[in-house]
Amino acid sequence: MKKKSLPGPPRLAERLLKQFFPDEGIFTTIGDLEEVYQSIAEEKGSAKARFWYRSQVFKSIFSYYKNQLLWSTVMFKNYLVFTSRLIKRDKFHYFLNFLGLSTGIACCIITMLFLRNELTYDQHHTNADRIYRISSNYVTSGKPLLYANTSPALGPRLKEEYPEIEDFVRVLPLPELLFRQGDRRLYQERIVFADASILKVFTHPLLQGDVETCLENPNTIVLTETLARRYFGDENPMGKVIQVENQDDLTVTGVIKNPPRNSHVPIKGIISYSSWGMDQLALNVSMYEPSVYTYVLLPEQYNLATFYEKFPPFYEKYCKADEELYGQVYKLIFLNLKDIHYNTVGFRFEMPLGNRSYIYAFFFIGIFILVLACVNYVNMATARSSTRIREIGMKKVLGSSKKDLVFQLLGESLLVSFIALVFSYGAVLLSLKLLNRLLDFSFETGMLINPVLIAAVLGLFLLIGILSGIYPAFYLSAIRSATAISRGFSSSRTGVRIRRILVAFQFVISIGVVIITLFMNRQIEFMRNRDLGFKKENVVSIRLRDNDVIQKIPTFKQELIGNPDIISVATGIGQPGSPTTGLYKLEGRDGMEDYNFWVLWAGFDFIQTLGAEIVEGRDFDPSFSTDRQKGIIVNETLVRFMGWDNPVGKRITQGSHTDGHVIGVVKDFHFASLHNKIEPMLIRMISRPEDNLPGSVPGYLMVRLKSQSLTNTMGWLEDRWNKFNPNRPFVFSFLDESFDRLYDADRRQNRLVKIFSCICIIISLLGLLGLSSFTSLRRTKEVALRKVLGASATQIVLIMFREFFFLIFLAIVIAIPVSLVFIDMWLGKFAYRTGISPLLLIATAIGAILVAFLTASYHSLKVARTNPVENLRYE
């Protein structure tokens, strides 16, 4: 009878065995297991045989990998010991590697901190996806005029007409409030008026107080924990009273956690919107009078198209009448909370915005420095690895596989990267305060222990370790053992060529960044020293904050004018660097035409105090009673814009407030930064408070001093101020300093690029120093022979530097045009800019060659001074 054939072993288990078991055991192991399987199947059945087979496969695989893990652990320990010995033996090169990589990783960590801070603006609010800020767009003759704020009446009216709007919040930031605390008087910034719903719509966790009631009543305030501690120390602030100069006292009804700094509305205290009659002022305000920031909370997945479809009836009810009065069509713009920080360029009265170019610059800086550090490591590793050829050959002879060697060399790279990571983390921790001060950042120590950042940094460590070590690992492991043992020290043409390319690449970046830095410095100095059309030096600007002070200004001015060291005194609402805007009708060729122009509100002697020049007509004159309400001075740009041949007497109106005419033309001067061209501008007189007209309350008192006695006059001026206003701190600024602050962002960018250029130079010089050390070692015998044949140390140094001179020269040739492209892009944002200086480029090139020569000559000179007998003794 024919014997019944039995089924084979389980296919999946057999496939796993072939996949995971070592190659040399596949056939014997599979054959043995299959024989036993057949035997068990005959005696006990196929089911038990399959179970046995699967269990044996599992045990075999587990045993194999357990042995592999054990062996890997032993080898890993061996790698650590071996690498530590290498570091001790070659301290100099490893120190350069640690320094370069630590610098690169530290810069990357700082970049991550900055990007995380900037790209998560306002995302700490739970409802961020559903919160929208409404902005205003006033369209005149097809031209949009964008305002970040809206009428205080908009929020309540929208809530009434649109039931789908879940809630609204009005926020009104206050410039400063004078808080009284005992005998002290402190100007407090970042205080806002807001509706009680702010604590429900936005995420401001309450530490003390009731979210439902703490801002419901008038004259109540919620403080941040920092402000509460500032005013009340360790006492419980709840129920305490804060005195406000010339206003009702405020009662503390809540304390919130300090908001993150990456919020577009920085808050230190919230006053209930019903305080001081603010809510009553909003009842009948026109939609054409923007003053507050309005936020609405919309339902999830709400389609804004639905809102705009319903807007026409709302417009007819609340806006149509004012459209005819103002000659503007009113439109609403919805911006999601997370988009405000970067997407509202061009909005008037906008909060401080983020700068995307700053973010891109910082990102690419971090990438460039990291690439430089990795290139530096690869360069040094390949140069140093040439001295390890015999070691690699011996390991191959003793049985090490290519995989083992790759793992060993990658392990060395990862260990170096890990040590560099530890040092870089410490360096960042120690430098946070310095970075905050230099670059106006707001980094905190706690940001370094953020889980996301830690995960990113660990990923960065692995990436750097693998990328930096992979080329040296494969480069060395590919060498044949016989060749390696016979040659011992190797420097193939390919390896040398690659190292030269890497050094040249480093210097291209370094020289390019130095050129960019120098031109940025040149542009900033150009802006600081350019003739602005007025004299900004020696002008003290004193901020006038409340009505009590303003009432005393006429008497105070007379007191100041009596001082022989004071040239002139004037009041103004705006000053150069901070003008306002307004919509006016001007007499044109086709009748009265609508325009939105810049406006400076000024008192008598404003032009004289500023040091500007009247080129046609006259200045404001107290003897002309109509000047205060009807007199207007315009600049030359406005005259050209309007095409006026005889500007004096031209009519200018504004709504029902102004029916004026041009009395004079002032020579063009820069009333804004040099980023922008001089634009059309009007200068109007400050009205009397009782006239109830725009420009009724001056904002600044400007005093021009004689430069010879500046310090003494400032002391006298403070003494006079304290006499007239004993309850107000003497807070002032110099006009030239205020104007210089317009370029703070440019200076921060310049400081950033300076730091970047220093780091790039350091890393490049480290690479050059390491490579020159390797070159000197490689050419030791050549140098000895040259010395024997009569060459001097200077000749030897020059011969050895010749190898690097070509690289530096090539880097200069590439870096100059590339950097000029970036410079032209950066200068493009300035209406007035400096030119390209060939001398600056030549000086940079010469400086780069000299620095490279001094760096490379260190090792060359040391070898050149060595006794040739020492190097030729065994030849």
What is the predicted role of each segment?
Residues T73-V74, L80-T83, R89-L115, G354-R390, ...:
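Hydrophobic alpha-helical transmembrane segments of multi-pass inner-membrane transport and secretion
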